[in-house]
Amino acid sequence: YTYRLPLFRMLKDAGVNFDFVGSRQQGLKGDFEWPRIDGEPFDTDHEGVYGIRTAKALARLPEAMKKWDETPDIAIIHLGTNDLKSPETFHEDVIVPQRDIVGLLRRGNPEVVVLLSHLHWPSGPAGNLRERVEALAAGLDSDLSPVRTVSYQDGFETKPGTDLLDGAHPGPSGSEKMARAYFEAMQPWLPEE
């Protein structure tokens, strides 16, 4: 499952002209056949990597960006889940790499809008990380290249078999809730019909 599929549908339903960007096209199961949305093939381009830590995502991004057909106008960054076991090093492991990822995106497009996603859990280590991500967004935000945080935790069930399949990865309902939050967050920057 991926939030990108319902986000694709929401953008199509809203009449938005868009193109997902990324060097990757496969999900966790490489042979999975994505459904068509209203007769159109799902745009599978993305830069998500299952199980990746934030610093590793930063390290692979410069090479990945060379494969992109376009530079993004809006970027969703959902990182940090795989760093939660080391809360004492959140700054070095999550915040600094996310800051540097925003810098790389801005080199590609100085006007990129960045949406920094909070993680699924509202408390515990993810809750502690939340404050740091808010501070990062506030420090990076500019008129030319806005940086906003996105939260979808209200009403999001984190027990296995609910919005999260296994307590960590979103299933269909969790993906839908994430997509809705991202779709609403990007509204001010979506192109007019």
Regions found by a protein language model. Give the residues of each.
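Loop/turn elements at helix/coil->beta-strand transitions in domains of secreted/extracellular proteins
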Residues: 14-19, 70-76, 109-115, 142-148, ...
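Surface-exposed acidic, glycine-flexible loop patches that form ligand/cofactor-binding
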Residues: 57-72, 103-109, 187-192
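Residue-level recognition of beta-strand->loop/alpha-helix junctions
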Residues: 22-24, 118, 151
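Conserved SGNH/GDSL esterase-like catalytic core that processes O-acyl groups on lipids
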Residues: 1-92, 96, 125-131
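Short, well-ordered alpha-helices that flank and scaffold nucleotide-derived cofactor binding pockets
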Residues: 5, 9-13, 107, 135, ...
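Active-site segments of SGNH/GDSL-like serine hydrolases
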Residues: 76-85, 101-130, 153
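Catalytic His-Asp segment of secreted/periplasmic serine-dependent ester chemistry enzymes
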Residues: 120-193
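N-terminal cationic-hydrophobic initiation segments that often serve targeting/anchoring roles
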Residues: 12, 65, 102-107, 137-141
